[in-house]
Each structure stands twice: as C-alpha cells, then as structure tokens.
From Swiss-Prot:
Residues 291-310 are annotated as: Disordered. The Tat system comprises two distinct complexes: a TatABC complex, containing multiple copies of TatA, TatB and TatC subunits, and a separate TatA complex, containing only TatA subunits. Substrates initially bind to the TatABC complex, which probably triggers association of the separate TatA complex to form the active translocon. This is Sec-independent protein translocase protein TatC. The chain crosses the membrane at residues 38-58, 109-129, 142-162, 190-210, 229-249, 250-270. Pfam families: TatC. Keywords: Cell membrane, Membrane, Protein transport, Translocation, Transmembrane, Transmembrane helix, Transport. Its main location: membrane. One of its GO terms (cellular component) is TAT protein transport complex. It comes from Mycobacterium leprae (strain TN).
C-alpha cells in the first residue's frame, strides 16, 4: 500500500508540473515535494543497502565479495606488520564483542548503499532546487548529477588506492617494537571515513562550476583567489584526512589542486561564451529611432522666380 501511495503522489506531482509550467508552489506544495523526494531517496538507499549487506560476504555477478575487497589493502601488508591471529594462517581482522561482526556488516552495507544510490539522491536534491531557477538553468540538472556521481566515485577509488600506502606507513613505523591487531570495526571505520572524505572533497570543483553557471562566481575572481585556494586545499587535506599520514594528505591535496585548476579553466571558457553571447544580443537589439526633424519652410524668393518663368 505504501508503494502504491508513493506512486500516486509521484504521478500527482508530475501532473501538477505539466499544468503549472511556471512552477509556482505554495508552502504546503513545497513540503509535499520535499517529503516525496526524501522518500524516493530513502527507498533507493534501502534497496542498495540490502544489496550491500548481501554483497558483503557473497560474490555477486562474478564480483568478489565486498568484505574481501575492502580487506585487501590490510592483507597486502607484510605479515610482520600485522598480528597473525588466525589458526589457519589466513589474514583476519579482530572482533572483540559478540555483535561486532553483525553491526560491522550493517555499517558496510549502509555505506555501500549510500554510494550506490548517490545518482538517485543527487538527482532528487537538484530537482528540488530547480523550481527556484529559470527554465534555462534547469537544463543543467543532468549535467549536475552525472559529474557529481563520477567525481564521488573517483574520490573513493583514489582513497582505496591510497589506503595500502597509508596503512603501510602507519603500521610499519613501529613494527620493530610492537605489532598491530586491528579490529574489524576500527579498520572499516578508518576505511569508510577515508572514502567519504575523498568522495565529498571531489565535489568541491563541481560546486565552483555551478556557482559560475548561476552567475555568483567569475573567472577573474577565481584567478585572484587561485593561490589561496590551492593552499586551502592542502590545509583541508591535512585537517580532515583520517590518520594524518603524508601519503593520503598529499594525494588528496594534489588531486584537489588538479580538479580546482580544471574547474577554473571551465569557468574561464564559460565566461568567454557568456561575453560573446551578450555581445550578440546587444548587436541584435533595435537601434534608437531619432525624433523626426521639422521640414524647412518654403523660400519666398524661390517661389516668385518660378512664377516669373511660367
């Protein structure tokens, strides 16, 4: 029944959008719209979370199980850097409480669900904002959702590649004196934090481009802020990177600097196109019509000479 009610509300929303092209909405309509889009986002996250919960310990569509895939950076470390607590000599993480494994599986499944459902809830977020924009600005909906999902995925991939280097530095530094026995909760918590920080950070250049498209940020201003923004990227990486190891901090700062420069160049091209477009519009405008001038009075001398000839 709830699914049917949700589909009815969605149909009513799209019916209203066809009959109300100006998108004028009352406060109640705005709240209804927000509730509908939140329900759609939550439904997508629930479905993908269930998928992630199953994928955690099972191979799906020929893919390796999510748990093995996430554990690989830790297991790739030398055996001298991690505690050998498994009787069969296999790489295992430590569980210190009865419900650790179950709760960890839920956390990992939920994190995977949020990432897999990111195209859906990114679209719902932007679609809720677009009624306050002009019609031409709504065309950028798809252009916002697709790059946002790609950038988030790119950030998580970079974080995964950096993870083994970060763990190698953090765990091998004092391996001559002590050995690290990581619990599953601590390890996956560190991993998920790293993935989220990298994924969210990669959205910053997209935010710059969207502010420029909205007319709130220009290339000249970004050009004057370039050095300060690059410095801010590395400060952000140093403060928010989990573990504070030099590998992850440098990787995040360098990646954000490259993406920032790419965003600045896109803003420069967009501003050039905007100036050319405004110049064409100015040329197409009608010229100002001057008021008519008065006709000079007929000369009396010229009239008389004409009469003499006739």
């Amino acid at each position: 029944m709830r699914a049917c009610d949700l589909l009815k509300r969605i149909k009513q929303h799209y019916r209203r959008s066809r009959t109300n092209p100006d998108a004028t909405m009352s406060l109640i309509d705005h709240l209804t719209e927000l509730r509908t889009r939140l329900l759609i986002s939550l439904a997508a996250i629930v479905v993908t979370t269930i998928f992630g919960f199953i994928w955690y310990s099972h191979s799906i569509f020929g893919l390796e199980s999510l748990g093995e895939w996430l554990r690989r950076p830790y297991c790739s470390l030398p055996q001298s850097a991690r505690a050998d607590i498994s009787p069969d000599g296999q790489c295992r993480l430590l569980a210190t409480a009865p419900f650790d494994q179950f709760m960890l599986r839920i956390k990992v499944g939920m994190a995977a669900g949020i990432v897999l459902a990111s195209p859906v809830w990114f679209y719902q977020l932007w679609a809720f904002i677009t009624p306050g924009l002009y019609t031409k600005e709504r065309r950028f909906t798809v252009a916002f959702v697709v790059p946002a999902a790609v950038l988030f995925a790119g950030g998580t991939v970079l974080a995964y590649l950096v993870l083994s280097k970060a763990l190698g530095f953090l765990l091998i530094v004092g391996s001559g004196v002590q050995v690290t026995a990581l619990s599953g909760d601590r390890y996956f918590g560190f991993l998920l934090n790293l993935l989220v920080v990298f994924g969210v950070s990669f959205e910053f250049p997209l935010l710059i481009v969207m502010l420029n498209i909205a007319g709130l940020l220009t290339y000249q201003r970004l050009k004057s802020w370039r050095r300060g923004l690059i410095f801010a990227m590395f400060v952000f990486a140093a403060v928010f990177t989990p573990g504070s190891d030099p590998f992850s901090m440098t990787a995040l700062g360098a990646a954000l600097t490259v993406l920032l420069e790419l965003a600045i160049q896109l803003v420069r091209l967009h501003d050039k196109r905007r100036v050319k477009h405004e110049a064409l519009i100015a040329d197409d405008e009608a010229s100002v019509i001057e008021p008519p001038s008065s006709i000079p009075e007929r000369s009396y001398t010229a009239t008389r000479s004409h009469d003499d000839v006739t």
